[in-house]
Design a protein with these regions (language model features):
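N-terminal export signals
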Residues: 4-6, 11-33
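C-terminal segment of N-terminal export signals and the immediately downstream linker at the start
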Residues: 5, 27-64, 256, 532
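Dinucleotide-binding Rossmann-like beta1-alpha1 core, especially the glycine-rich loop
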Residues: 89-166
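Rossmann-like flavin
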Residues: 132-225
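A glycine-rich dinucleotide-binding beta-alpha-beta segment and adjacent secondary-structure elements
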Residues: 208-218, 380, 438-502
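Helical element adjacent to the flavin cofactor pocket in flavoenzyme catalytic cores
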Residues: 236-275, 284
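Mid-domain catalytic core of redox enzymes
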Residues: 274-394
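C-terminal segments that line or cap access tunnels to active or ligand-binding sites in enzymes
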Residues: 344-457
């Protein structure tokens, strides 16, 4: 069995950058591939998992006439792109800000014919950052304004700030504008970490904190994240500003689910995949669910976790040893701790949407990554009613207090949690939540503790329960190794999600399209060269 090759690091970065530009995609190519498969109903596809990657894959295949069965163990589609109701409040599970309009998500959703069914709101600022040493608000869709504000607070690092953001803008010009320079900034940054790149220009750790503030979105420290990747991803935010799918992220998930069903695809909720079935020729023939019902398939796209796929759903000895080794070398990403608050009044005194609060005097050492006592970690505050009018019912406010979290502090509660013995676990999560509220009340929202009408707390174990992701991971595997190809060494098995392509709304949507396209290429090849 031939192993699907991994991309070398340099090729991986180049492929990632090409994929981030809609202009690099052959948008007509998908339809041409579909036309090459005349008897589409003879090529059924099963997708495991209705996260955004699975939804996009299923939407593409159903739109072009293929028989699609999407299996989802939960009651709703979307994975983390969903919401839940408590009293008068509807809380978004995951979305704070993304880039959709004028970027890859708009291109994908337009290609599927559903972009016009969605609306986005723009964040009023890029970010506000509050620390013991400074309080700064970075403006949205205004790279020069960001630089000017950093100049104001850190005049001693003026030249370094200018040079850092100039280099970021050059990357964007090379990537999106197709411009060429005597020295390629993409080539310069490709071998560097974010920490190394920043250190070429500035020394003040507070300035580095501001420059690297978005690294938490990718679940890695500046010493681990690739400089070029960060320049591209953060450059999108600088230029386009943070955006939000109205009225909640589940509107995006529902639009994709509606697209699937409108094109005669099936979504089976409360249906957990059990194992992938192979025929007597060792070809994939379907997926058996936990109720022992087999759903026929010529190809399977996995939007579930890779550990579950290869350890629980695949027969043993199906994977080449080298591929197994590549998987085993990967590290599960961080999870999250979130406090969802519904307030009984409007917050007229605070107008910011996203606020980072860190009260450690050496803020750069942690940069919103978890501390030994999670209660003292940096907090990301999102006040959703400052995003658009009518987010909450009149006179009330919806907000979240969130930090990244390792799984290790929660592991000791795991067995009791899944056996519904949660007293000790509940005390710990409430201790952390109360400390978060106390800190935010003192620094940002006076009187917060007296406004709370509804409070829900999500931990890594909560994430694990609802998504079945190992350790409650929110980004799949860490980005410290190159992404996996959609096509696996097992013929007919494809990957589409955070575990293969990296976490975040945009990467998993791109993964969904890539996986569906890879399936069609294999179908076309099998027609041209039938099995003997």
């Amino acid at each position: 069995m031939k192993q699907t090759p991994y991309l070398p690091r340099r090729n991986f970065i180049k492929t990632l950058l090409m994929a981030s530009s809609a202009a690099a995609i052959d948008w007509a190519g998908f339809g041409k591939l579909a036309e090459a498969v005349p008897n589409k109903k003879d090529f059924p596809v099963v997708i495991i998992g209705a996260g955004l990657g699975g939804l996009v894959s299923a939407a593409y295949l159903a739109r072009y006439g293929f028989s699609v069965t999407l299996m989802e163990q939960h009651a709703v589609a979307g994975g983390y792109a969903t919401s839940f109701d408590r009293g008068d409040f509807t809380f978004d599970v995951s979305l704070h800000a993304t880039v959709a309009e004028h970027a890859m998500p708009q291109a994908i959703l337009s290609d599927l014919g559903i972009w016009d069914n969605l609306k986005v709101a723009y964040a009023p600022e890029l970010r506000r950052i509050i620390t013991p040493g400074f309080d700064i608000t970075l403006p949205a869709k205004n790279p020069k304004g960001v630089i000017t504000e950093l100049f104001r607070v850190f005049p001693h690092e003026k030249q370094g700030i200018h040079d850092f953001y100039s280099e970021m803008e050059q990357v964007i010009s090379e990537l999106w504008g197709g411009k060429r320079f005597d020295i390629s900034m993409m080539a310069k940054l490709e071998p560097l970490t974010l920490e190394q790149w920043m250190s070429l220009h500035v020394k003040d750790p507070d300035v580095k904190y501001c420059m690297a503030v978005f690294s938490g979105y990718y679940g890695l420290s500046p010493a681990e994240i690739n400089a070029l990747f960060y320049a591209v991803a953060t450059g999108e935010y600088l230029v386009h500003g943070g955006q939000y799918y109205k009225t909640r992220s589940r509107d995006l998930s529902n639009a994709l689910a509606d697209c699937i069903e409108a094109n005669h695809g099936k979504i089976l909720y409360h249906t957990e995949a059990g194992r992938i079935v192979f025929d007597h020729n060792n070809q994939i023939s379907g997926v058996m669910d936990k109720n022992k019902i087999t759903h026929p398939a010529k190809a399977v796209i996995a939007n579930c976790s890779i550990p579950a796929l290869f350890n629980k759903m695949m027969p043993k000895n199906r994977l080449p040893p080298e591929f197994e080794k590549k998987i085993s070398q990967r590290r599960v990403s961080l999870s999250s701790f979130a406090v969802f608050l519904g307030l009984n009044k409007a917050l007229d005194q605070v107008h910011d949407y996203e606020i980072d609060l860190d009260q450690d005097k050496e803020v750069y050492k942690n940069l919103l990554l978890p501390k030994a006592d999670l209660a003292e970690s940096g907090i990301s505050i999102t006040i959703y009613d400052n995003l658009f009018k009518g987010y909450s019912v009149p006179g009330k406010t919806t907000l979240t207090l969130m930090c990244l979290s390792n799984f290790e502090p929660w592991k000791k509660y795991e067995a009791d949690y899944f056996n519904n013995r949660k007293d000790v676990y509940n005390r710990e999560k409430e201790r952390i939540a109360r400390r978060f509220i106390e800190r935010v009340e003192k620094a940002v929202i006076p009187g917060l503790s007296h406004m709370i009408e509804v409070m829900e707390i999500g931990t890594p174990l909560t994430n694990m329960f609802y998504t079945k992701n190992p350790q409650g991971a929110i980004y799949g595997f860490d980005r410290n190794l190159p992404q996996l190809n959609s096509k696996t060494p097992v013929k007919g098995l494809y990957l589409a999600g955070a575990w293969s392509h990296g976490g975040g709304y945009t990467p998993v949507m791109m993964a969904g399209r890539e996986a569906a396209e890879s399936v069609l290429k294999e179908f076309k090849h099998s027609i041209a060269q039938p099995e003997t």
